[in-house]
């Protein structure tokens, strides 16, 4: 009984529709039990579980088609049950007799019901595990899709695309409005034309035909004109300029060095051209300069100067074309010196980076300083900062203007060309070999050297103010001095140092006194690189300038042996000096070279270095020019 019932239950469970299989009464079953065969029990599945399975199935296959999924052979085993669950199960209601047997615990169907419930619970547990797995898969897919969406938004930069889309929409709206305005204007122009009433049927037909032909001809002409010249007319349409903000690169030592090298390579053709011109003027190669001078003067005399320069430009471009094609053409008056290119290091230490930045900054500072000096001199020349210099240019321009008005251009061009050739090839050569002659008679050189820069103007203004203050203080001191003192005693007291009178300390004559600019001197330190002892190598003190001497008073020793007196006539070279090259800036020192010293004497740590240099240099030029004029006379 139990075995037959269990096999019948399994057959019912394996049926495709899920309905119960009611077997006909068998005689052997009746003989075994002594009564009619029992009816099978069908457990009704829960509707909540089926609804949950349907929802999970929709979640799992959301966004995908059935054809995109794996085949049944590669899909999990639970797919068959899921597909079977989509068909609603219709089970017949059990009869009252079956319900009585279910309620009877001692009945023969108890074991069958227990086995069926156990199998059903097992299948429900498997389905719950499967549901749990589907939920985990869905959550993981959701997480991965969110990550991909976030990365996709970051890569495509949706904000910028949205802004660009808004701009395009706005532009489209504006174009539509313009098109509507144009169409409206055309529609208003057409009915505005006067229409004459027809006098007759033939006249009306002829008039309409003529109007149609004229309108067709006008439209064709307009279409042809728009096709030919519409593109050019559109080019002249004014459009608002878009302000684009350029992103600035951060400061980088490697980038700064590379930019300086690029600037040097870019300026190399210009510097080579200037060097070749200077070599022609200096007659570096006698044959080349002689040929160039002869060709130039003949071209100017016959009026071929402009064609000659144009031919030289064409020749230069032709040579550049051949060089670009691979030809090795090297021609230069001055031999080129190949500079060793240091290989770029990948890893630099902190000290190397710092030194690299300092070197590049120093080169950039010097380059910018030279460019600023040139531009400031040109600006001061045209702004009448130095009237006597600008007046010469003013007179020269008036003379050139009057000459161009009264003389023919051929004669003016001939005069200018001949003067330029003689000046470039002959006069400049003589002036470069004779500096004193150039300082007296080379007018362009004198004008350019005398033009001041803005820092020099500020220094002169500051020196004038300080001189006025010192003059006022000296007048007040003299007026407050005792009446018994003579003028010489007052002057000697005023020009005395901390250790005594000025001329006694430096063993000079009484008329040697500091200039008005440096009456109190400049605090500095004397660096004598000829000495080896540290006490003699660096001395602290005060520097004075007289009419004929440069005097240094040491502040440590009372002996006058440690003081330094240099005659201005003995100075061979004087220039600004930078004691520590590591520090930024142009330095705070002055280097003075004399025949008695192997290495220049350096006066360092001077706060007013530029003022002291200008004073010493101007007094030196004054003394040397006076001596030269005295020797010539």
From Swiss-Prot:
Primary location group: mitochondrion
Keyword line: Apoptosis, Coiled coil, Endoplasmic reticulum, Membrane, Mitochondrion, Phosphoprotein, Transmembrane, Transmembrane helix
GO biological process terms held by the UniProt record: apoptotic process; negative regulation of toll-like receptor 9 signaling pathway; positive regulation of apoptotic process
Keyword RNA-binding among UniProt keywords: no
InterPro entries for the chain: GRAM, GRAMDC4, GRAMDC4_PH-GRAM, PH-like_dom_sf
Cell compartment(s), UniProt: Mitochondrion membrane; Endoplasmic reticulum membrane
Region (Disordered): 1-46, 72-109, 182-216
Modified residues (Phosphoserine): 75, 79
Bias-annotated ranges (Basic and acidic residues): 27-39, 95-104
Coiled-coil portions: 134-190
Topology in membrane: Multi-pass membrane protein
Bilayer-crossing regions: 295-315, 389-409, 411-431
Ranges of Low complexity composition bias in the record: 190-205
Gene Ontology annotations for the cellular component aspect, listed alphabetically: endoplasmic reticulum membrane; mitochondrial membrane
Domain GRAM: 500-578
Subunit annotation: Interacts with RTN4 (isoform B).
Annotated function: Plays a role as a mediator of E2F1-induced apoptosis in the absence of p53/TP53. Inhibits TLR9 response to nucelic acids and regulates TLR9-mediated innate immune response.
Protein name from the UniProt record: GRAM domain-containing protein 4
Organism in which the protein naturally occurs: Mus musculus (Mouse)
């Amino acid at each position: 009984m139990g075995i037959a019932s269990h096999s019948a239950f399994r057959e019912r469970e394996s049926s495709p529709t899920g309905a119960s299989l009611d077997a006909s009464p068998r005689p052997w079953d009746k003989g075994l039990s002594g009564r009619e065969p029992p009816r099978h029990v069908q457990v009704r599945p829960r509707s909540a579980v089926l609804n949950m399975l349907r929802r999970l199935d929709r979640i799992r296959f959301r966004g995908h088609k059935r054809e995109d999924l794996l085949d049944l052979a590669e899909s999990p085993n639970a797919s068959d049950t899921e597909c079977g669950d989509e068909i609603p199960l219709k089970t017949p209601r059990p009869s009252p007799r079956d319900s009585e047997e279910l309620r009877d615990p001692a009945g023969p169907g108890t074991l069958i019901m227990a086995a069926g419930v156990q199998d059903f619970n097992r299948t429900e547990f498997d389905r719950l595990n499967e549901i749990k797995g589907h939920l985990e898969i869905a959550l993981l897919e959701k997480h991965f899709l969110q990550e991909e969406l976030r990365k996709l938004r970051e890569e495509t930069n949706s904000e910028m695309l949205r802004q660009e889309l808004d701009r395009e929409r706005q532009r489209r709206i504006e174009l539509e409005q313009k098109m509507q305005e144009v169409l409206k204007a055309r529609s208003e122009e057409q009915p505005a034309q006067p229409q004459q009433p027809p006098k007759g049927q033939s006249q009306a037909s002829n008039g309409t035909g003529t109007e149609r032909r004229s309108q067709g001809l006008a439209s064709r002409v307009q279409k042809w004109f728009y096709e030919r010249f519409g593109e050019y007319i559109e080019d002249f349409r004014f459009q608002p300029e878009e302000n684009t903000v350029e992103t600035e690169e951060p400061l980088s030592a490697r980038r700064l060095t590379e930019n300086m090298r690029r600037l040097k390579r870019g300026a190399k053709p210009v510097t080579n051209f200037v060097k070749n011109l200077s070599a022609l003027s200096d007659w570096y190669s006698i044959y080349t300069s002689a040929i160039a001078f002869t060709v130039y003067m003949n071209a100017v005399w016959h009026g071929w100067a402009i064609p000659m320069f144009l031919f030289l430009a064409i020749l230069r471009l032709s040579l550049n074309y051949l060089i670009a094609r691979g030809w090795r053409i090297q021609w230069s008056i001055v031999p080129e010196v190949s500079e060793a290119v240091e290989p770029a290091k990948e890893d630099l230490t902190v000290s190397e980076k710092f030194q690299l930045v300092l070197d590049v900054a120093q080169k950039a500072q010097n380059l910018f300083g030279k460019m600023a000096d040139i531009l400031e001199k040109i600006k001061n020349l045209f702004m009448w900062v130095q009237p006597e210099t600008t007046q010469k240019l003013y007179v020269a321009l008036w003379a050139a203007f009057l000459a161009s008005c009264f003389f023919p251009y051929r004669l003016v061009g001939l005069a200018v060309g001949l003067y330029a050739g003689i000046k470039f090839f002959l006069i400049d050569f003589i002036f470069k070999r004779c500096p004193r002659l150039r300082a007296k008679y080379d007018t362009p050189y004198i004008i350019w050297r005398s033009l001041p820069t803005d820092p020099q103007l500020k220094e002169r203004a500051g020196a004038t103010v300080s001189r006025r203050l010192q003059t006022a203080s000296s007048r007040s001191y003299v007026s407050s001095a005792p009446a018994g003192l003579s003028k010489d005693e007052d002057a000697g007291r005023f020009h005395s140092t901390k250790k005594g009178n000025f001329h006694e300390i430096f063993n000079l004559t009484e008329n040697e006194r500091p200039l008005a600019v440096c009456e109190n001197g400049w605090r500095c330190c004397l660096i004598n690189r000829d000495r080896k002892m540290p006490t003699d190598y660096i001395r602290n003190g005060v520097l004075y300038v007289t009419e004929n001497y440069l005097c240094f008073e040491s502040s440590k020793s009372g002996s006058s042996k440690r003081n330094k007196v240099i005659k201005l006539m003995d100075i061979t070279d004087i220039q600004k000096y930078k004691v520590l090259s590591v520090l930024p800036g142009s330095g705070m020192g002055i280097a003075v070279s004399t025949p008695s010293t192997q290495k220049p004497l350096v006066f360092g740590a001077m706060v007013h270095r530029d003022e002291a240099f200008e004073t010493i240099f101007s007094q030196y030029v004054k003394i040397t020019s006076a001596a030269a004029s005295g020797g010539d006379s």
